[in-house]
UniProtKB/Swiss-Prot annotation:
It catalyses: Release of any N-terminal amino acid, including proline, that is linked to proline, even from a dipeptide or tripeptide. This is Probable Xaa-Pro aminopeptidase PEPP. Disulfide bonds: none annotated. The gene is PEPP. One of its GO terms (biological process) is proteolysis. The lineage of its organism: Eukaryota, Fungi, Dikarya, Ascomycota, Pezizomycotina. Gene3D superfamilies: Creatinase/methionine aminopeptidase superfamily, Creatinase/prolidase N-terminal domain.
Length: 468
C-alpha cells in the first residue's frame, strides 16, 4: 500500500523564484522597486495550562518565500540586491536534552534556496545594517505578524498594506515544483481512497474507514491531513462538513446498513494539499436511487471539466453545473417546471447549496479566490472562487447533490417555492444523504490537467468495494 517517499521533485523548493515574483507584484501594485520584505514563521505555542506544545503548522506565506518549515524562524528579502536571508533558532542546550540538536546554519544553507542563513538573535542587527547601508528605506511586512522585540525604527517607511496581498496573489499561479508536490499529494491520497473502497463493506463504524485512510497516507510519507477528514455515512452525507466520523454503519433502530459513505479527505505533502471527495456504497453496490443521483453528479462534474481553461469565468462553470443538476432532477421527477424557471428561482440551491470549487495549494481553500459572501444570489454566495481562471492555477471541481431536511424543508413549506419540488418523489431519496465528486485540476491555456487518480466511475468503485 505504501508509496515510495523518494518520488519527490528534484532540487530545492524555489523560494528565490517566489521572492522575486512577490517583489514584482509589489512593484506592479505601485509600491516601488526597492526595500526589504520581512516575514516571520509561526511561533511555538504551548497548550493552555500545560507544558506540551500545540501541533505546529508553518505560516504559508512565510514558507512560500523560504521553503523553511522550522518554527520560530524569520526571513528578509532585499529586493534590489536580490538577497534572501532566513534566520533560524540557535542551539538551546536545555532543549537539546529533550529534542536533540536543531538544524545548523550550515545544514540550512544546503537545504533551502536562500542566499544566507543567520541566527534569530541577529534579526534586528541585520535590519539595522540594511538601513545603514541603504539609507534606511522601506520595509514591507504583514500587520499583526511582527514580534514585539523586532524594531523597524531605522526605516524611513513601513508598509503594512501590500505584502499580504502580493504574496497571496502570487500564490495563485503554481510553478512546476509546486504542481509536482500537489500531484504527489493527490497520488498518495487517491491510493488511500482506494484502500477505503476495499474496506467499505466490512467496516462497522465511520472511524474505522477514517483510520484506514489516515494510516495509508502516513505510511506513504504524509504525516498531516490537509483538513479534518469527512467520513459521512448515510444521511450524515447531507452535512457538507460533517466532522463526527464516529457513527455505526448499521442503523441501531432499523438494523439496516446505511447506503453509502461520502469520503472527503486529502493528505498534505510537504505543505501542499490534496482535496478529494468520493462516494462508496457500503453494501458494495449502489442502490437504484443512489446510482441515479451519482450519475447526475458525475455529469455535473464532467460538464464542468469540459469548460475549464484559462480565462473562463468560474461563475459560468458553476452555473452550468446547476443547470445539469436541474435537468437531472427534472428527469427523476424530484423537480417540476422548466429548466430556465427553476434556475432563475434558485431551486437547485436546495440540493446544491455550495460553490463548485476553490483554488488549492498550501491551503485547502487557497488564496486569490476573491469570494463575495455578501452576494444576494444564493447560487453564488458560497462560491469561493470568482472571476476568470488563471493558467497555472489549481482548482477543485466538486459538484454535489444533497438531501438535507434543514435546507430543503423551508423550500417545501414556501407558498412560492414548494410547488417546484415533488415531495412524494423526494421521499425516496432522503436515505441517499448526499453525493459529491471532487477532483483537483491544473488550469492550462487549452484545458486542464487532472491531478486526481482516485476512481470515480461507479462500476469501478463497486468492483473495488467487492474485491476480495
Amino acid at each position: 500500500m505504501a508509496i515510495s517517499v523518494d518520488q519527490t521533485p528534484a532540487g530545492k523548493y524555489p523560494a528565490k523564484v517566489h521572492a522575486k515574483r512577490v517583489a514584482a507584484r509589489i512593484q506592479e501594485l505601485g509600491h516601488g522597486d526597492s526595500g526589504i520584505i520581512y516575514l516571520e514563521g509561526q511561533k511555538t505555542h504551548m497548550i493552555e495550562d500545560s507544558d506540551g506544545e500545540m501541533p505546529f503548522r508553518q505560516r504559508r506565506n512565510f514558507f512560500y518565500l523560504s521553503g523553511c518549515p522550522l518554527p520560530d524562524s524569520y526571513l528578509t528579502y532585499d529586493i534590489k540586491a536580490d538577497k534572501l536571508t532566513i534566520f533560524i533558532p540557535p542551539i538551546d542546550p536545555a532543549s537539546v536534552i529533550w529534542s536533540g540538536l536543531p538544524l545548523s546554519v550550515e545544514e540550512a544553507l544546503e537545504i533551502y534556496d536562500v542566499d544566507a542563513v543567520l541566527s534569530t538573535a541577529e534579526v534586528n542587527a541585520s535590519l539595522a545594517h540594511y538601513c545603514s547601508a541603504q539609507g534606511g528605506k522601506k520595509v514591507f511586512a504583514i500587520a499583526d505578524q511582527v514580534s514585539p522585540h523586532i524594531t523597524f525604527l531605522p526605516f524611513q517607511e513601513i508598509d503594512f498594506d501590500v505584502l499580504k496581498r502580493a504574496v497571496e496573489e502570487s500564490r495563485v499561479v503554481k510553478d512546476s515544483y509546486e504542481i509536482a508536490l500537489l500531484r504527489r499529494a493527490n497520488e498518495i491520497s487517491s491510493k488511500a481512497h482506494v484502500a477505503v473502497f476495499k474496506a467499505a463493506t466490512s467496516a462497522r463504524n465511520e472511524r474505522e474507514l477514517e483510520a484506514i485512510f489516515v494510516g495509508a497516507c502516513m505510511s506513504s510519507g504524509c504525516r498531516e491531513q490537509s483538513y479534518h477528514p469527512i467520513f459521512a455515512s448515510g444521511t450524515n452525507a447531507a452535512t457538507l462538513h460533517y466532522q463526527k466520523n464516529d457513527e455505526d454503519l448499521v442503523d441501531s433502530v432499523t438494523g439496516q446498513r446505511r447506503l453509502n459513505m461520502l469520503i472527503d479527505a486529502g493528505a498534505e505533502y510537504r505543505n501542499y494539499c490534496a482535496d478529494i471527495t468520493r462516494v462508496v456504497p457500503l453494501s458494495g453496490k449502489f442502490s437504484p436511487e443512489s446510482r441515479e443521483i451519482y450519475d447526475i453528479v458525475l455529469e455535473m462534474q464532467n460538464s464542468s471539466l469540459a469548460m475549464i481553461k484559462a480565462g473562463v469565468m468560474w461563475e459560468d462553470v458553476h452555473s452550468t453545473s446547476h443547470r445539469v443538476a436541474i435537468r437531472g432532477l427534472l428527469k427523476l421527477g424530484i423537480l417540476r417546471s422548466t429548466e430556465d424557471e427553476l434556475f432563475e428561482k434558485g431551486i437547485s440551491v436546495a440540493f446544491f447549496p455550495h460553490g463548485l470549487g476553490h483554488y488549492l495549494g498550501m491551503d485547502t481553500h487557497d488564496t486569490g479566490g476573491n469570494p463575495n459572501y455578501a452576494d444576494k444570489d444564493p447560487k453564488f454566495k458560497y462560491l469561493r472562487l470568482r472571476g476568470p481562471l488563471a493558467s497555472g492555477g489549481v482548482v477543485t471541481v466538486e459538484p454535489g447533490i444533497y438531501f438535507c431536511r434543514f435546507i430543503i424543508d423551508p423550500y417545501l413549506s414556501s407558498p412560492d417555492l414548494g410547488k417546484y419540488i415533488n415531495a412524494d418523489v423526494l421521499e425516496r431519496y432522503w436515505s441517499v444523504g448526499g453525493v459529491r465528486i471532487e477532483d483537483n485540476v491544473v488550469v492550462t491555456d487549452s484545458g486542464y490537467d487532472n491531478l486526481t487518480t482516485a476512481p470515480k466511475l461507479p462500476e469501478e468503485i463497486e468492483r473495488l468495494a467487492t474485491e476480495k
